[in-house]
């Protein structure tokens, strides 16, 4: 059609990539309250769409689209739950962008060096306690580099290292060892 201009936002393209491709990255999660020193937690994440698998120290979590698996190596315990939206977003902040983008005011701007796009989502209404969500995406590849989530006085930042889209499809569930205590709370 002549004269038709279609503008595709970076956020829309990024969300499509998350739905269609498998993202894998190491990260450092930093959590800070206004008066406290920040705490850092290293980990790794693999995700596609709503499904994800992440590891942080002695904790592993996975979501297969229905069941949340939370494993603690310290207690050798695996909890199975049907998570709420809030529990999913607390486990994987990318899900906020996937689930809530339509309910937010969205702005996009180039970083000072022009190599990234900074996407800010501000909920129009109180949404799961989140006041602001900022995502930094590498231009061209649409790989996420950083996510910042503000909830009241708490700021959580997820800085990704070596993000890539992979072709190997991982299992988005955790299988217990024979000695693992399984606590099935899916009722």
What is the predicted role of each segment?
Residues 44-91, 151-156:
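An acidic-aromatic
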Residues 7-26, 38, 67, 71-131, ...:
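Flexible, processing/modification-adjacent segments and terminal tails
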Residues 113, 124-131, 139-187:
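Non-transmembrane domains of secretory- and envelope-associated proteins
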Residues 43, 52, 59, 104-108, ...:
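Residue-level detector of beta-strand structural context in well-folded domains
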Residues 38-41, 55-57, 64-65, 128-133, ...:
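Short, surface-exposed coil-to-beta transition loops
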